[in-house]
From Swiss-Prot:
<feature type="binding site">
    <location>
        <position position="165"/>
    </location>
    <ligand>
        <name>substrate</name>
    </ligand>
</feature>
<keyword id="KW-0055">Arginine biosynthesis</keyword>
<dbReference type="GO" id="GO:0006592">
    <property type="term" value="P:ornithine biosynthetic process"/>
</dbReference>
<dbReference type="InterPro" id="IPR042195">
    <property type="entry name" value="ArgJ_beta_C"/>
</dbReference>
<keyword id="KW-0068">Autocatalytic cleavage</keyword>
<dbReference type="Pfam" id="PF01960">
    <property type="entry name" value="ArgJ"/>
</dbReference>
<feature type="binding site">
    <location>
        <position position="255"/>
    </location>
    <ligand>
        <name>substrate</name>
    </ligand>
</feature>
<keyword id="KW-0028">Amino-acid biosynthesis</keyword>
<keyword id="KW-0511">Multifunctional enzyme</keyword>
<dbReference type="GO" id="GO:0004358">
    <property type="term" value="F:glutamate N-acetyltransferase activity"/>
</dbReference>
<feature type="site" description="Involved in the stabilization of negative charge on the oxyanion by the formation of the oxyanion hole">
    <location>
        <position position="109"/>
    </location>
</feature>
<feature type="binding site">
    <location>
        <position position="143"/>
    </location>
    <ligand>
        <name>substrate</name>
    </ligand>
</feature>
<comment type="pathway">
    <text>Amino-acid biosynthesis; L-arginine biosynthesis; L-ornithine and N-acetyl-L-glutamate from L-glutamate and N(2)-acetyl-L-ornithine (cyclic): step 1/1.</text>
</comment>
<comment type="pathway">
    <text>Amino-acid biosynthesis; L-arginine biosynthesis; N(2)-acetyl-L-ornithine from L-glutamate: step 1/4.</text>
</comment>
<feature type="binding site">
    <location>
        <position position="176"/>
    </location>
    <ligand>
        <name>substrate</name>
    </ligand>
</feature>
<dbReference type="GO" id="GO:0006526">
    <property type="term" value="P:L-arginine biosynthetic process"/>
</dbReference>
<feature type="site" description="Cleavage; by autolysis">
    <location>
        <begin position="175"/>
        <end position="176"/>
    </location>
</feature>
Length: 381
């Protein structure tokens, strides 16, 4: 079923010839009204020109009207030309939409170190037809993903729709993929930015597929106010629900993955320590490999936990896998075959109780398979 964007938003895409596959690869997301926006970008020191330009626009505090995305070319590590090409992409999109370039955010994803084919973008932008539906945009921004990622929620009459891409080179560092959330709620920019930081910390920053943080990743929230005011607490609960659903979709669609891993840590000294511990477990290559092999090797969970920096006493920790207690201050008797069968599910939950306080947090990951190696051996990054 088609997902309708919030009031005042339109989107569309085309095949510009950037992806060798010939699939859709150039997309626009547009607000008919100036929108307040909140933005989180990769902290990778080799960040792409689109990220540097986005940070400058964000610092200006001016409203945003549109996003132009190319998928297939990261426009990263392309020297001064890359910065000029990124500016040109914004100018071309602004010309197409009748806006100023300062109202247009750029985003690029794909192969690093290859000049951006601006001439293809120039030819492709006029071909994009804008509609009030999300699917064309969601499809066009994909690279090694196997499926589009769209989530939605409604809060007191206002709508929130999220679109994301991400499959590999996913690891927490401020933002971990391309994610675009749009809403017709009216939210003051200062409140929007503060709330978005908290949402990103709890959702997108808790996803890890392979431990690599991309050079191009961002998470964006636009609010154009077309519906009007809504209760802020309920609004951000809705935003977090959409972001969490997208984060889970990204982890489940990890390159070569066969299952989603959800790690829940409770009883931590602080919420931050709980999130850190959960991320460490979700990102452990040894545990991810055991997950793929349906091996309930709790020692790998404990080892990852010990490297997380979270405070705990190994003699008090409790580890539960798919509802089966494996460890509680020492070895517990359990049926390994039963635990292995439970790990064959499409979603596997690890629950860890540190018994240090009230802090709780989640992280999302996936298993590590031969297909991950194959995909990344064949795909130029």
């Amino acid at each position: 079923m088609a997902v309708r964007l919030p009031r005042g938003f339109r989107a569309g895409a085309t095949r510009a010839g950037i992806k060798p596959s010939g699939r859709p690869d150039l997309a626009l997301l547009v607000s008919g009204l100036p929108a307040a926006w909140a933005y989180a970008a990769t902290q990778n020191r080799a960040a792409a020109p689109s990220i540097h330009r986005g940070r400058a626009l964000y610092a200006s505090g001016k409203p945003l009207r549109a996003v132009v995305v190319n998928a297939g070319n990261a426009n990263c590590a392309t020297g001064e030309r890359g910065y000029e090409d990124d500016r040109r992409m914004a100018e071309l999109a602004a010309l197409r939409l009748g806006l100023s370039p300062e109202e247009v955010l750029t985003a690029s994803t794909g192969v690093i170190g290859v000049p951006l084919p601006v001439e293809k973008i120039a030819r492709g932008l006029p071909e994009i037809g804008l509609t009030p539906f999300a699917e064309a945009f969601a499809e066009a921004i994909l690279t090694t993903d196997t499926r589009p990622k769209v989530a939605e929620a409604e809060v007191a009459g206002a709508r929130i729709v999220g679109l994301a891409k991400g499959s590999g080179m996913i690891h927490p560092n401020m933002a971990t993929m391309l994610a675009f959330l749009v809403t017709d709620a009216l939210v003051p920019q200062e409140a929007l930015r503060a709330g978005w930081r908290r949402v990103v910390e709890r959702t997108f920053n808790q996803v890890t597929v392979d431990g690599d943080t991309s050079t191009n990743d961002l998470a964006l929230l636009m609010a154009n106010g077309a519906y009007g005011e809504v209760p802020l607490k309920a609004f951000f609960e809705g935003v977090e629900a959409v972001a969490q659903e997208l984060a889970r979709m990204i982890a489940r669609d990890g390159e070569g993955a066969t299952k989603l891993m959800v790690v829940r840590v409770v009883g931590a000294a602080t919420e931050e320590e709980a999130r850190r511990a959960a991320r460490a477990i979700a990102g452990s290559a040894l545990w991810k490999s055991a997950l793929y092999g349906n091996d309930p090797n709790w020692g790998r969970i404990l080892a990852a936990l010990g490297n997380s920096g979270a405070r705990f006493d190994p003699l008090r920790v409790r580890i539960v896998l798919q509802g089966i207690p494996l460890y509680e201050g020492g070895v517990l008797p359990f049926d390994r075959e039963e635990a292995g069968r439970a790990m064959r599910a499409e979603e596997v939950e690890v629950l860890v109780d540190l018994r240090e306080g009230q802090g709780a947090g989640e992280a999302y990951g996936c298993d590590l398979t031969e297909d991950y190696v194959r995909i990344n051996a064949l795909y130029t990054t």
